Amino acid sequence: MFKKQSRQKGREKRHLRIRKNIFGTPEMPRLSVYRSEKNIYAQIIDDLNGVTLVAASSLDKEFDAKGSNKDGAKLVGELVAKRAIEKGVTKVVFDRGGYIYHGRVQELAEGAREAGLQF
């Protein structure tokens, strides 16, 4: 009998497939998303140098909303975009981390776009 693959393992395999094609450069770094059950995290990464340029999450001190809902995800997107623009980053490559582009991941992306990031 075949064993059913867990959702987490499937997401990790999808993420590896996506990462083969997505690569962040100093001119156009990668906006990476991680979604846990209660929080959401976003970081902008320069893969060429292996450096995280900017990071934001629903656990930050500046963050006052709830991180487990869409409104919180949108605020995290706006926060990471604001910090990126302060560092001089305006264009990024979006890495959804193997998650479906729906719900909190979509809201984070839309919040970052509204705050001025281009992808």
Swiss-Prot record:
Pfam families in alphabetical order: Ribosomal_L18p (PF00861)
HAMAP family: Ribosomal_uL18_B (MF_01337_B)
Keywords: Ribonucleoprotein, Ribosomal protein, RNA-binding, rRNA-binding
Record carries keyword Oxidoreductase: no
Classification of source organism: Bacteria, Bacillati, Bacillota, Clostridia, Eubacteriales
Record-stated family: Belongs to the universal ribosomal protein uL18 family.
A GO biological process held by the record: translation
One GO location term (cellular component): cytosolic large ribosomal subunit
The gene coding this protein: rplR
Protein name: Large ribosomal subunit protein uL18
PANTHER family reported in the protein's UniProt record: 39S RIBOSOMAL PROTEIN L18, MITOCHONDRIAL (PTHR12899), LARGE RIBOSOMAL SUBUNIT PROTEIN UL18M (PTHR12899:SF3)
Ribonucleoprotein recorded as keyword: yes
InterPro entries documented for this protein: Ribosomal_uL18_bac-type, Ribosomal_uL18_bac/euk
GO molecular function: 5S rRNA binding; structural constituent of ribosome
Assembly and binders: Part of the 50S ribosomal subunit; part of the 5S rRNA/L5/L18/L25 subcomplex. Contacts the 5S and 23S rRNAs.
Record's function text: This is one of the proteins that bind and probably mediate the attachment of the 5S RNA into the large ribosomal subunit, where it forms part of the central protuberance.
